[in-house]
Every structure is written in structure tokens, then in C-alpha cells.
A protein has these predicted regions:
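Active-site and donor-binding regions of nucleotide-sugar-utilizing enzymes
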Residues: 1-67
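Short active-site oxyanion
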Residues: 22-27, 119, 157-160
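Conserved catalytic-core segment of nucleotide-activated headgroup transferases in glycan assembly
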Residues: 52-134
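A donor-sugar binding/catalytic signature common to diverse glycosyltransferases
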Residues: 148-172
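Tryptophan-centric aromatic hotspots in well-structured domains and transmembrane helices
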Residues: 42-43, 88, 92, 147, ...
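Helix N-cap/beta->alpha junction signal
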Residues: 30-33, 124-126, 165
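Nucleotide-activated donor-binding/catalytic signature segment of Leloir-type glycosyltransferases, i.e.
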Residues: 128-147
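Acidic, amphipathic alpha-helical patches
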Residues: 17, 107, 150-151
């Protein structure tokens, strides 16, 4: 089921009255299984939504690009070299003007439990102005790279991705 007609989605009548997506001629989606949901949520006629894959992920199949992103990560966080990289990328909470990130992640416990095989890199949503602080003594293990690398860069580097309802899970 799409978000149309749900408590937080638009009604079919509203979508008819205000066709936000009425000027679209093509919409690309990741697979045939999700075409119906986009047609319903965007109130589009059949044939506009096509399963071609998502062009935004094309770069993830370019080995040179991926390797260059990893090298960029190692320049910023040398501790990541030869370790599994966990990307922690939650979406924002609240309203755009006061957006926040979850602040209950226990980096100390992650460090203790995972040992020397892993590092965590954090990427907060661009709306978040004051992300949680990672203690200085854990910077060898966990680092907030929001200001230094794009989400695309970090997706190339990640062996594991921890997120929530952020749309980036469709790209990973």
C-alpha cells in the first residue's frame, strides 16, 4: 500500500485537484514490483512509471569511482583502512527547522562488542544542524563524516548500512 489515503498521505481527491506530478512524462523506479505504489502515490496513469533501475546508483558499479571514494575515506579516517565500515545514516526527526538525529546510539558498547574489525562512520541528514557528539576517546572507532563526505561516497565505502526509514536504504 502506498501513502495515498493514509493518515499522513494525500487523499485521492486532493491528488486529483492538485496534480503535483502532472507534468511528469517518465518516472524511473528500482523494480517492477514497486511500479503500482508510485502510480498510486503520485496519482500517475499507467505507462509513466518504468522499472529501469535508479540512475543515482550507477556510480556504485564503477570500480574506479568506488575505489576513489574509499581512498578519500582513508585520508579522512585512516583507522578505516583494512576494516569493515559500518555506515550509520538515520534520517532526521521532527520538523525541518528544528531537525534532530537520534542520540541514543551507544558507540562505546559498539566499540567494545565489535572490537578492532570495524569502524562506524556517521552521516546525518542535511537538515540536522546539531548532530550528537561522538566522544573524543572513540574517534578511532566512530566518526561523524557529515561535513566531509557525501552519502554517495559513504555508500560506496560501507560494508554494512544502519538506517531507519531514510530512503537511502533503497540505494544501498
Amino acid at each position: 500500500r502506498s501513502t495515498a489515503e493514509l493518515k499522513f498521505g494525500s487523499s485521492a481527491a486532493t491528488l486529483d485537484k492538485y496534480p503535483n506530478y502532472g507534468n511528469l512524462t517518465h518516472v524511473t523506479v528500482s523494480s517492477p514490483e514497486v511500479i503500482w505504489a508510485y502510480e498510486e502515490a503520485m496519482h500517475l496513469p499507467k505507462g509513466i512509471v518504468k522499472a529501469t533501475g535508479v540512475s543515482r546508483t550507477d556510480q556504485f558499479y564503477d570500480k574506479e569511482f568506488v575505489e576513489s571514494r574509499k581512498q578519500k575515506l582513508y585520508e579522512i579516517m585512516p583507522e578505516a583502512k583494512d576494516k569493515k565500515v559500518i555506515l550509520y545514516a538515520p534520517t532526521f526527526r521532527g520538523h525541518v527547522a528544528t531537525a534532530s538525529s537520534p542520540d541514543r546510539i551507544d558507540f562505546e558498547r559498539f566499540c567494545r562488542e565489535l572490537g578492532n574489525e570495524y569502524v562506524i562512520v556517521c552521516k546525518h541528514h542535511p537538515f540536522v544542524k546539531n548532530p550528537p557528539i561522538i566522544p573524543e576517546e572513540l574517534q578511532h572507532f566512530a566518526r561523524d563524516l557529515t561535513k566531509y563526505l557525501s552519502i554517495e561516497d559513504l555508500l560506496c565505502c560501507a560494508d554494512i548500512c544502519i538506517s531507519d526509514y531514510s530512503s537511502l536504504v533503497f540505494e544501498y
